[in-house]
Swiss-Prot record:
This is Transcription elongation factor spt4. InterPro entries: RPABC4/Spt4, Spt4, Spt4/RpoE2_Znf, Spt4_sf. A zinc finger (C4-type) spans 18-38. Belongs to the SPT4 family. One of its GO terms (biological process) is regulation of DNA-templated transcription. One of its GO terms (cellular component) is DSIF complex. It comes from Aspergillus fumigatus (strain ATCC MYA-4609 / CBS 101355 / FGSC A1100 / Af293).
Length: 156
């Protein structure tokens, strides 16, 4: 295929998702071009260490957006304003504290998705996950994490 976005089956192991915007690309494409949505803050282009810290091989679901400005799926996933491409529905991983600080210093409003059993805050949504009632915290105002909490990141 002639598209630069085509990924052969043998290359699928090297797919990674940006932990800030959820864009999915090959490791080599992150290395060559960086992340088109947030490279100005993350500096992934040509930086293998940053790619390892700020992208993840653990993600679920794929969404391909041709025109994020008019797509209801882009609005639903909060991907409006991003470039056309393939995005993960859920990215699992944890950004280093210094990267989160850099995002905040750059004026990027970074809020991770967090699944927490038990207590809930205003605006939470009940979900049934694996037969267990879980609160889905979409927009936490104050986020306190412990080592027991699994965090899935998304840009809001």
């Amino acid at each position: 295929m002639s598209s630069s976005y085509y990924v052969t089956p043998s290359q699928q192991r090297t797919l990674r998702a940006c932990m800030v915007c959820s864009l999915v690309q090959l490791h080599s494409k992150f290395m060559r071009d960086g992340c088109p949505n947030c490279d100005n803050v993350l500096g992934l282009r040509g930086n293998n260490d940053a790619i390892q810290e700020c992208t993840s091989q653990v993600f679920e679901g794929l969404i391909t957006l041709r025109d994020p400005s008019t797509s209801w799926v882009a609005r639903w996933q909060r991907l409006e304003g991003y470039v056309a491409g393939t995005y993960a529905v859920k990215v699992t991983g944890s950004l280093p504290d210094d990267v989160i600080t850099n995002l905040e210093d750059s004026g990027v409003r970074y809020i991770p998705y967090v699944y927490l059993p038990g207590s809930c805050v205003s605006g939470d949504t009940d979900r049934l996950v694996g037969g267990m009632a879980v609160r889905w915290r979409r927009r936490p105002e104050v986020l306190e994490l412990s080592s027991e909490v699994e965090v899935q990141f998304a840009w809001i």
